[in-house]
Amino acid sequence: MMSQTAKVLLLYAHPESQDSVANRVLLKPALQLPNVTVHDLYAHYPDFFIDISHEQALLRDHDVIVFQFPLYTYSCPALLKEWFDRVLSRGFASGVGGNQLAGKYWRCVITTGEPETAYRPDGFNRYALSDILRPFELTAAMCRMHWMTPLIIYWARRQSLSELASHGRAYERWLADPLTPGGF
């Protein structure tokens, strides 16, 4: 197992970040942690032209990769999908010789616009969020990464500021020590 001071790369992908109170609350403490690198994909790549070698270098330099994004149409925002397709290339993350991410950890941190009850067979979305997120889990497996249980903030816009602050504190504790069993 890795040391408790694991280096965390937090890849943040929100096309309307200025409107997301929940994500701002989650990100604020992460920016202060010495072991966490926050990388805002929409701020870095507003034109969607991703610097693949830079992104791959960031991945190589970190132990835990966190993908923080809002759930959009049962998936991630478009830039993050483009990032997956371009950065997690064969020969780097998968395929012959593609073992650069093997043994690292993958965690999704997701905000939704609906309550948890919407994500079940009798709910509005008809499927559990774990089913909807299966492509991310499969991508982590393809990269030989350890899949960590996603952190989900359901109905993020309807959470009170005190509820969001509580999530933010728990998230900060987890980011500071992400490989301790029983963490957030």
UniProtKB/Swiss-Prot annotation:
Q: Which InterPro entries match?
A: Flavodoxin_fold (IPR003680), Flavoprotein-like_sf (IPR029039), K_H_efflux_KefG (IPR023947), KefG/KefF (IPR046980)
Query: What Pfam families does the record tag this protein with?
Result: Flavodoxin_2
Query: A single Gene Ontology molecular function, please?
Result: FMN binding
Subcellular localization, per the record? Cell inner membrane
State a GO cellular component annotated for this protein.
Answer: plasma membrane
Record key words, sorted: Cell inner membrane, Cell membrane, Membrane, NAD, Oxidoreductase
Q: Which residues form a coiled coil?
A: none
Q: Name one GO biological process term.
A: potassium ion transport
Class of this enzyme: oxidoreductase
Query: Can you tell which superkingdom this protein's organism belongs to?
Result: Bacteria
Q: Which residues form the signal peptide?
A: none
Reaction(s) catalysed (UniProt annotation): a quinone + NADH + H(+) = a quinol + NAD(+); a quinone + NADPH + H(+) = a quinol + NADP(+)
Q: Membrane topology for this entry?
A: Peripheral membrane protein
Q: State its Enzyme Commission number(s).
A: 1.6.5.2
- Similarity comment: family membership: Belongs to the NAD(P)H dehydrogenase (quinone) family. KefG subfamily.
Q: What binding partners and quaternary form does the record give?
A: Interacts with KefB.
What biological function has been recorded for the protein in this entry? Answer: Regulatory subunit of a potassium efflux system that confers protection against electrophiles. Required for full activity of KefB.
- Read off the NCBIfam families from this record: PRK04930.1 (NF003430)
Q: What is this protein called?
A: Glutathione-regulated potassium-efflux system ancillary protein KefG
